[in-house]
Curated annotation (Swiss-Prot):
Biased composition (Basic and acidic residues): 159-168
Pfam families assigned: iRhom1-2_N (PF12595), Rhomboid (PF01694)
Bilayer topology: Multi-pass membrane protein
GO biological process: negative regulation of protein secretion; protein transport
Organism: Xenopus tropicalis (Western clawed frog)
Compositionally biased residues, Polar residues: 1-12
Gene for this chain: rhbdf2
Top-level lineage group: Eukaryota
Gene Ontology cellular component list: endoplasmic reticulum membrane; plasma membrane
Name of this chain's protein: Inactive rhomboid protein 2
Organism lineage: Eukaryota, Metazoa, Chordata, Craniata, Vertebrata
Functional summary from the UniProt entry: Regulates ADAM17 protease, a sheddase of the epidermal growth factor (EGF) receptor ligands and TNF, thereby plays a role in sleep, cell survival, proliferation, migration and inflammation. Does not exhibit any protease activity on its own.
Subcellular location(s) of the protein: Endoplasmic reticulum membrane; Cell membrane
Amino acid sequence: MASLKKNGSSSRLQDRKPPNLSITIPPVEGERDPKLMQPLTKPVFQKSVSLQEPRGHVAEGGTADVRPGFKRQTSLSQSIKRGTAQWFGVSNDWEGKRQQWQRKSLHHCSLRYGKLKPQYQRDIELPSQETPSFQATESPATHRLPKIVDPLARGRPFRHPDEVDRPRTPHVGLPPQTPGMLSLASFTSVRSGYSRFPRRKRESVAHMSFRAAAALIKGRPILDTPHSRKAGQKRSFIYPSFMDEDTVDAAETLDSSFFSKVDMHDETFSMPDDVFDSPPMSASYFRAPLPIPELMPGAAIEAAKEPVKSVQVYTPDHRRGKRIASQVKHFAFDRKKRLYGLGVVGSWLNRTYRRSISSTVQSQLEHFNSHRPYFAYWITFVHILITILAIATYGIAPIGFAQHTTSELVLRNKGVYESVKYIQQENFWIGPSSIALIHLGAKFSPCIRYDEQIKNLIEKQHGLERESGCCIQNDKSGCVQTHRKDCSETLATFIKWPEHDAPVLDEVTGMKRTSGAVCHQDPRTCEEPASIQPHVWADDITKWPICTYQAMNNHTGIRHMDCEIKGRPCCIGTKGSCEITTREYCTFMHGYFHEEATLCSQVHCLDEVCGLLPFLNPEYPDQFYRLWLSLFLHAGVIHCCVSVVFQMTVLRDLEKLAGWLRISIIYILSGITGNLASALFLPYRAEVGPAGSQFGLLACLFVELFQSWQILAKPWKAFLKLLGIVLFLFLFGLLPWIDNIAHIFGFLSGLLLSFSFLPYITFGTADKFRKRAMIIISLLVFVGLFASLVIWLYVYPINWAWIEYLTCLPFTNKFCEKYDIDQVLH
């Protein structure tokens, strides 16, 4: 009978129990399973009794204290394989991570690509599950009935439903509702404090001694007065010592709830299912007394109906002080989620989700958090810093779209002043000149690989230098290395071997030298390096080394050695051209003057123009690191501002979705691929900036749109809007100083990399295999594209003149000046 009675009452309680409520009652001490009372065979492996065991963790067999068996440690190859599969999102145990990716995807889509379908939109509006809450165990909410707050919960760590996605700021004091109802949790809850302030723990002797010593050193009284405590700095959160565990008597709780008056209108909406929704404990300490209409006189009632401008609630000294401003807390704790497919651009384009979306996709959005945009902030800081340093070091070039010409009277080789012109390309970005940008690390093909055209130009200059000689002025004003046609037959004497006192090349045969002479350099007088066997200087002045030490200076008896030299090599321009001229002319032309050399063949002008690290072989440029170094440079202030705006909107938004590692890989590889293509098709144009990287990020938006196609309400409208933005940017790239080639190939590489690295929502089990195939195909195509560009750049260079029209349209004759090899442009 007792068992039947017990079973009957249990069934009645089971019928009244809410469907989602689970209550675990521990067994009575005397009714434990005898199997659990038996000692273990290996007491060494018993768990400590001082640790609190979590509920629901006991195995079915009743062996709660038995540890699981030992497992073999996974090998390094298996760990790498599993980690790689998880990173690409194709592992077998990736279900939880996939749900997080898909929740974040919907958040991003709702902000970037427009309105979603209604079922996806409802899933986004569900409360977040980031923090522990009992909302998942509540019964379904009834319509047109407000939630009832239990006044007897007394500070349990529950939160309001509308608080879950907001910062954890203290609540405004709410009056207790349903004062006559007493819940079971009210008698057993700890960490209480609903009706009174929790007591403070005593300070330790060490803490009080340290505080007294600090007070004596600072000259303050040891015992604080109430006034000094009041003047101290307040805190918005109480110390942990205030939150000691103490059980409050139920009668005291009933008293506090009984004297809390509420309106009877709220009493009629009491529901047992919502009794667990209680305000946070901080709300109970600052409740302002509410006016009771039946106890107030008529004048007071009229005054109470007027709007209250400001209410100041007095709080005692022992309670917490001033709170942090709500604006500061919202700024500090605000972590807005990014909906997949609805990011910043989606909010600009007014995208939404569609209505018909399966519940499987909705369930994937519940644990989807946004990443911190560390890479966006870092790259923006680096861009701003480098731009400031570049402008401070090299200054600002003439502003405009055409060429800038400067004229000035400059002392030339013949000792007379001549009017010379200096032509340079204008920069409308408000920044350094192209020479300065090349020196800083701009993308410039002659500095990256061996260029056949530049090599032919240098060989042509060396051929002319072999026929040169020393032109000595008859008035003994000086001498200069030049050609016969540039030396006056009346006012000067042209010294050329073997016509004028040529030295002997071979002592055995008596053959004399035919290449020379060279002003201020002769094999007979140079001692370092000396022209002796077996290191005799060749009969070709273009192969002579620089003489670092002369035995006799001005009294050798050799005419081209005793004269005063007027010109030395000067590297001018960006193509490695060299002239023997004066220092004044070299400075005016923004060249590099070599005081130690006497011939242009003794200097390597291309190494001087490129700067940075010297070439391993001066004849073969090898600065391939310019392909990614130029991503951190900008052509000017406006260029940098455009990049900052793009990175603070699009880049930061995408990084919140995919994380810094995936976005940084796409950013860097897209930029390198774009610069590689630009170096191939536009070899003689100095380009800087992350143009390819930015268009690679725009390709990420397209991939995200394609993967969110099934959940968007109007996907074609979002696609056309995004396509219009990209086409406008491509048309804008037809202006000079904007690299459209880097835009195109950066977009293609970003498209391929996004299919491999970006997460996206899956619609069924077949999507897993589809994603694996997509990753493999995308990576293979990207590797093939990158390898083809490298081979074309270093092995089989391509020179297509028509491709320049893709990056600049010549609206005028000088709007897009060609950077061919024959022009001396800067």
